[in-house]
Amino acid sequence: MFKFRSVLLSLLTTALVAGFASPGSTGETSPGLVGAWIVTVSRPAGVGKNLLTFSSDGTFFRSGDTHPVLSGGHGAWKRVGDREFDATYIAFRFDENRKWIGSTKTRIHIISGPGDNEFTGVAKVSTRDLQDKEVGTSEVRLQGKRIQVEPF
């Protein structure tokens, strides 16, 4: 009976300790991307702004200054290094009459820093038609700043 209690206590202790570990904890040295960011985008046509929100479950959402010709974007992200992340999102494209004409698939590589609330990145954009055939590509530079809660 004593041995059974010891084993049971050991299992409960292990389960309790495991319960306090954060999901996906890898001993990371930076807080990561989770949160909301305002991003300056250097495009071939000029500088623009995007809002990116990275969720802890690996999904993320993008909205930008290209509305109404580009929808909000939905995508996924993951950590690929200590301060490096890759992400992919898809957004729908519309013409000036708001007719659906295709999509964009954007792949992003982000390096966080120099502080915990900044990042730089590169995005490779694939412009696609209604049959999902690539009809153009471009590359843009990103500079992100974490959106912080400000005192009321």
Q: What does each of the following model-derived ranges do?
A:
Residues M1-L11:
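Bacterial N-terminal signal peptides that target proteins for export
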Residues S30-G46, G75, G121:
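Tryptophan-anchored aromatic micro-motifs
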Residues V47-F85, A91-F92:
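N-terminal glycine/threonine-rich, aromatic-flanked beta-hairpin/loop signature
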